[in-house]
């Protein structure tokens, strides 16, 4: 879904923003604090229901306002989101109210590339698991269904473990069965997708870090040789003592291994940033291969990447048919990259929350 129109109301210092005639690449420049990143934040809110900067709606809803609204239009779809300060939200697709955020997310596959962040590598399994599940959601049709049932059973089982101390196997049996059934499905789906993803990943890794050898290794979160049900039965008493479920796909990890150890231990900060970009580009490539185009948010491109890496990233995103919304302090170098690569783009100047077209 490529956006042709974007309206933003009451997101941080953006009181009213109306953008038309959006291009494959849309570049927002201005001083720090002008509101550039808030534009990306608003698009992220529309696609995912949350900000990438804070989990608290009142922190991004304009001061003394009750809500924030983001609306976008493509050649075929209209989608909108109203977020209340309470956290409640109203979502619409083509004028009809929809019940789940997933319905918007399916229409608007979105990747946020932040060249300053190394969280995916340095901050434990959760962000890597989320990265994998983003891909699963968009390329494996049955994943969301299985994940919903698994998550529901996990929540119920953990509630029992937290509230009751003398639980028998019979008490947990219904949840064990549901966790086992859907957990095995999730494991099988993830294993297949990681194998496919690794092919795309190696291609993008070779372009950004040609001297590095890195493999994606999926760790399922339970002992696959005996199965999840056996782990749940074996860990029954320990789970009661811990008050949570230790084994299952919710504990999975995507390990990034080099011949010299794990990526978080052996790579430099600069290498980690390029590795994360390669991971996300390869996911975008996998969607592109199934005729799904991704909207990409690219924050502060020129701050962390050298000129060669900047040009390679822009060129690759263009090859993959992505629509890009990027922020920069140095729009001159970005303009040069786009001109050199003959990419259609639009410049926007941002000043104190006001966004205006700028000369290309």
From Swiss-Prot:
Keywords from the named record: ATP-binding, Cytoplasm, DNA damage, DNA repair, DNA replication, DNA-binding, Nucleotide-binding, SOS response
SUPFAM superfamilies, per the entry: P-loop containing nucleoside triphosphate hydrolases (SSF52540)
Signal peptide start and end residues: none
GO molecular function, one term: ATP binding
Binding residues annotated for ATP, in chain numbering: 30-37
Pfam families: SMC_N
A GO cellular-component term linked to this record: cytoplasm
Location within or outside the cell: Cytoplasm
TM region positions: none
Domain of life: Bacteria
GO annotation, biological process: DNA replication; DNA synthesis involved in DNA repair; double-strand break repair; SOS response
Free-text function comment from the UniProt entry: The RecF protein is involved in DNA metabolism; it is required for DNA replication and normal SOS inducibility. RecF binds preferentially to single-stranded, linear DNA. It also seems to bind ATP.
Annotated family: Belongs to the RecF family.
Protein name: DNA replication and repair protein RecF
Gene that produces this protein: recF
